[in-house]
Amino acid sequence: MNSIEFPLLDQTTQNSVISTTLNDFSNWSRLSSLWPLLYGTSCCFIEFASLIGSRFDFDRYGLVPRSSPRQADLILTAGTVTMKMAPSLVRLYEQMPEPKYVIAMGACTITGGMFSTDSYSTVRGVDKLIPVDVYLPGCPPKPEAIIDAITKLRKKISREIYEDPISFQRENRCFTINHKFHVGYSTYTGNYGQEFFYQPPSTSEIASDTFF
């Protein structure tokens, strides 16, 4: 069920000896034991909760929900993310050990949804805060779509090449409280002071193409 193809795992001998690499073996062990951290804020989370029942039985994928980010390697954001919630979401992501993955579930998480038109406190896309691996559109998405997103993530993990965490290049992530985003570096110390919510400089000091 949901078999994943490995280029180097199909070379077997008559003595049942498997020829593979450490990288493929590590990917194989990780894709069948994803431990998600559920970050649900609205109706999308209810759809995910239905997977726990016997009808869908998401335990067959090796998913074990965790309540601590230090024990999780997958965070699933479901629902609206506001500016006040943004620092806690970034902190949870930074506390997760490498390698870690993100599934953005629902229109409100991906683009802000219906709240993005007239709300001043809604984040227009969680990818402004943390990198997203799989986008799952819908309002809300069905449980079958969630299973499909998890399957796509497992296929992505099976083809990964291990990267040294020290040399891993992180992208610039930032946010402000008034939706005038300015490119800057994330804070990885775990200490979130007033300097994290910096005052955006005037438009005369920044080129127009730096806003998004």
Curated annotation (Swiss-Prot):
Keyword Nucleotidyltransferase listed: no
Keyword Cell inner membrane set for record: no
Source taxon at top rank: Eukaryota
One function term, GO molecular function aspect: iron ion binding
PANTHER family from the UniProt entry: NADH DEHYDROGENASE, NADH DEHYDROGENASE [UBIQUINONE] IRON-SULFUR PROTEIN 7, MITOCHONDRIAL
Cofactor: [4Fe-4S] cluster
GO cellular component terms given for this protein: chloroplast thylakoid membrane; respiratory chain complex I
Subunit: NDH is composed of at least 16 different subunits, 5 of which are encoded in the nucleus.
EC number in record: 7.1.1.-
Gene this protein is translated from: ndhK
Keywords, sorted A to Z: 4Fe-4S, Chloroplast, Iron, Iron-sulfur, Membrane, Metal-binding, NAD, NADP, Plastid, Plastoquinone, Quinone, Thylakoid, Translocase, Transport
Protein's membrane topology: Peripheral membrane protein
Pfam assignment, any one: Oxidored_q6
Protein family per UniProt: Belongs to the complex I 20 kDa subunit family.
Entry's localization field: Plastid, Chloroplast thylakoid membrane
Protein name per its UniProtKB record: NAD(P)H-quinone oxidoreductase subunit K, chloroplastic
GO biological process: aerobic respiration; electron transport coupled proton transport; photosynthesis, light reaction
Biological role: NDH shuttles electrons from NAD(P)H:plastoquinone, via FMN and iron-sulfur (Fe-S) centers, to quinones in the photosynthetic chain and possibly in a chloroplast respiratory chain. The immediate electron acceptor for the enzyme in this species is believed to be plastoquinone. Couples the redox reaction to proton translocation, and thus conserves the redox energy in a proton gradient.
Reaction(s) catalysed (UniProt annotation): a plastoquinone + NADH + (n+1) H(+)(in) = a plastoquinol + NAD(+) + n H(+)(out); a plastoquinone + NADPH + (n+1) H(+)(in) = a plastoquinol + NADP(+) + n H(+)(out)
Enzyme class, spelled out: translocase
HAMAP family: NDH1_NuoB (MF_01356)
Organism annotation: Phaseolus vulgaris
Cofactor note: Binds 1 [4Fe-4S] cluster.
Binding site residues for [4Fe-4S] cluster: 43-44, 108, 139
